[in-house]
Amino acid sequence: MALNATTGKLAWSYQTVHHDLWDMDMPSQPTLADITVNGKTVPVIYAPAKTGNIFVLDRSNGKLVVPAPEKPVPQGAAKGDYVTKTQPFSDLSFRPEKDLSGADMWGATMFDQLVCRVMFHQLRYEGIFTPPSEQGTLVFPGNLGMFEWGGISVDPNRQVAIANPMALPFVSRLIPRGPGNPMEQPKDAKGSGTEAGIQPQYGVPYGVTLNPFLSPFGLPCKQPAWGYISGLDLKTNKIVWKKRIGTPQDSMPFPMPVPVPFNMGMPMLGGPISTAGNVLFIAATADNYLRAYNMTNGEKLWQGRLPAGGQATPMTYEVNGKQYVVISAGGHGSFGTKMGDYIVAYALPDDAK
């Protein structure tokens, strides 16, 4: 929504998910840019959503600049609830091109791949926006989001943007009220909700559990890739390149002292930054690296090893004519990366050309 900063009155609003039952909120700050549409400069807002949609609206009036038609979605809500018949789907989107199937299930061994396939067929799944159920519903993209709080980075001069979407399925299971899952919050309770277990949802007929769809070994049941780095052309609002980012080096059950030579495409928390030199920087992935890429074609230019998880967005600054890139390497508890309290800065050598 947009508010008049002087009066506080609502100027316009746009709903990206109708009757949200999946935790598909808008996770990150929107990004403002001026783009050229039919030869005219249009002030727009880019709003990345957990669904993978990027909604592009004229920020002066809230009208869509990139179409987002309403399309039919799965029906059949839990008892006492409802689902809308349609949801908006932006034409600028990273959402999966096809629904998951049993053939997409994956594992580090034949055993956990088989278990993942069995679990997949036990869940309700009819594609994106399948309603939550007592049976258990596969939510894909998962409620962690294809986009999270890192958002996207826009280079207004080159009219390009950088995005780092990910694709991890989750399982949503409705828990009927009963012992340990009361309708109302107990009077002596101190707060509500945790990162794991039943989310109480006081006042409605069900609690809910939301968990990543993992194999017995703790790996995603969906085959890789799980994370990408991508470039968008803001003149056309099209995706021009997309590449896997991140290795399993720091997610293995045993230490890997040397770099893993292949990009699997890892889950991420954090965002990219773009610089005037046509270079983007990003950490975020579940392996402990800060990386630099060519913004035009996605070529990896450099990577530096971090002492802990880089689940943060880098920043850049200049001192005495020299540019630095800095990242907070603190790790992330629920993400499983190495914890720390480091601030790490990088710069080119003084004799670099």
Question: Which positions does each model-derived feature cover?
Answer:
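Beta-sheet-rich non-transmembrane sensory/scaffold domains
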Residues: 1-353
